[in-house]
């Protein structure tokens, strides 16, 4: 689909990266999944996949429909629908990852839809305006504050959403829906994301003025101010180091690159600054 549109459009990247027919399996998947109002089964697997970049489990050849929400069964369903692929092992278990950017869009969309089904909807019109301000005016603080406000509000409604997976997962899902950027995350270790580079889609929106490297840190809700200070200092060093990588320098091109440090204590954003 991509190559066909690209070559037949004078080698210009198509605005819609996703062919509609690929959504068929995604819709089937949503029909099969039980709407879990406690937000504990299917969504938690997706949150782990988004936050850590991978999930581990055992590939099942078959299982009854009523047991779809068991983690191994749900992961197997994702595999058979092509939403994850096998990428080796981790601690003796099969390691599953998202295979490509097209599928990544579906996974993030599923996560956002699951939030919405559980009453965790966001003001789309407001967020669209903040996305525009992020890209063209450099208004990064209001953009990330809006995400933070949503996280705080939603976690107050459902205690089980509290935690690092929810904070990271929701932030990544929201940035993935930003029409002006493609979030690129690095995996320096098995513990998850270290940095997020909001790669400006300059081939589509040639007048984007700003790009961003974001270091997102998390501490528990009972963490002290000293712990937050240490996390902030670590984040500042890491975000500056990441900003100097070749991938970021080439991706940012002529835009103004911002180095953003964010620290959450529980579900409350306590640091949001430019380094």
Question: Model-predicted segments: where are they?
Answer:
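Domain-level recognition of nuclease-like catalytic cores that cleave nucleotide substrates
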Residues: 247-275
């Amino acid at each position: 689909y991509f190559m066909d549109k690209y070559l037949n459009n004078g080698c210009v990247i198509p605005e819609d990266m996703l062919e509609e027919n690929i959504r068929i399996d995604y819709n089937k998947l949503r029909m099969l999944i039980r709407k879990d109002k406690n937000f504990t089964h299917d969504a938690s697997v997706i949150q782990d996949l988004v936050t850590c970049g991978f999930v581990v489990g055992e590939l099942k050849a078959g299982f009854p429909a009523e047991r779809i929400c068991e983690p191994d069964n749900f992961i197997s369903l994702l595999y058979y629908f092509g939403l994850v692929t096998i990428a080796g092992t981790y601690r003796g278990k099969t390691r599953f990852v998202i295979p490509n950017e097209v599928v990544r869009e579906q996974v993030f969309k599923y996560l956002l839809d699951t939030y919405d089904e559980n009453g965790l909807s966001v003001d789309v019109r407001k967020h669209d305006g903040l996305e525009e301000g992020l890209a063209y005016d450099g208004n990064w603080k209001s953009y990330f504050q809006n995400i933070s406000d949503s996280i705080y509000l939603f976690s107050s409604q459902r205690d089980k959403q509290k935690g690092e997976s929810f904070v990271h997962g929701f932030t990544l899902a929201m940035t993935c829906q930003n029409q002006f950027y493609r979030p690129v995350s690095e995996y320096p270790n098995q513990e998850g994301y270290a940095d997020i580079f909001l790669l400006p889609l300059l081939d589509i929106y040639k007048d984007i003025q700003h790009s961003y490297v974001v270091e997102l840190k998390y501490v528990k809700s009972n963490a002290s101010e000293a712990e937050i200070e240490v996390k902030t200092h670590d984040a500042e060093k890491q975000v500056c180091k990441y900003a100097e990588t070749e991938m970021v320098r080439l991706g940012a091109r002529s835009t103004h690159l911002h180095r953003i440090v964010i620290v959450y204590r529980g579900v409350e954003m306590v640091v949001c600054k430019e380094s």
